């Protein structure tokens, strides 16, 4: 968040917010293994990773082979996904773009709307053609910082400080309050049950 703020306050106040559609479910096995194979030369390790990827999933109590995606909840899945998206990082660095990424949540910051639209087109094409992933164009957008929600934070311009700042996004706060209320009500209900049981 602090890195994003530094970039915004350096004049990069147009945001390219790219949403990857069902990222963990759509990782292309062949492309991922090609990337891994550039670094790992041990055939046994490659074989183990490949077996992990195709280990299958349970859908409605039925076993199905997995031909794409990484196993949900698997210990290796976040690491393998990050290896895939590291290729995106390298491409954006090569293009000299200002960006921050956490897992599959990535935003790019540029200096003009025209640049933002061009980056949206080019990076979306790279993601789909080179990485074999799907960009959700309905959720992806070009926006200003005030319209952005990233990792639970919203951004606003402070005219007195002459800079962008961040604070917990209103939707994140509302979600947190709702969750706390649910937990409190549940705890209160359990306490009442225990109290009645002792009477």
Can you name each region flagged by the protein language model?
Residues 54, 130-196:
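A conserved non-catalytic segment of reverse transcriptases
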Residues 2-149:
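Conserved polymerase palm-domain catalytic core
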């Amino acid at each position: 968040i602090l890195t994003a703020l530094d970039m915004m306050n350096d004049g990069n106040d147009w945001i390219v917010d790219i949403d990857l559609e069902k990222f963990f479910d759509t990782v292309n096995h062949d492309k991922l293994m090609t990337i891994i194979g550039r670094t790992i030369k041990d055939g046994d390790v490659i074989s183990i990773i490949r077996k992990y990827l195709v280990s299958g999933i349970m859908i409605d109590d039925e076993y199905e082979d997995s031909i794409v995606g990484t196993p949900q909840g698997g210990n290796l899945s976040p690491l393998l996904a990050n290896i895939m998206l590291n290729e995106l990082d390298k491409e954006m660095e090569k293009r000299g773009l200002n960006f921050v990424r956490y897992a599959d949540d990535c935003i790019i910051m540029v200096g003009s709307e025209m640049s933002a639209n061009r980056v949206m087109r080019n990076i979306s094409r790279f993601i789909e053609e080179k990485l074999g992933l799907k960009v959700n164009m309905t959720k992806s957008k070009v926006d200003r910082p005030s319209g952005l929600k990233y990792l639970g934070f919203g951004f606003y311009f402070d005219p007195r400080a002459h800079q962008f700042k961040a604070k917990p996004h209103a939707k994140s706060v509302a979600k947190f309050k709702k969750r706390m209320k649910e937990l409190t009500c549940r705890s209160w209900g359990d306490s009442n049950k225990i109290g009645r049981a002792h009477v």
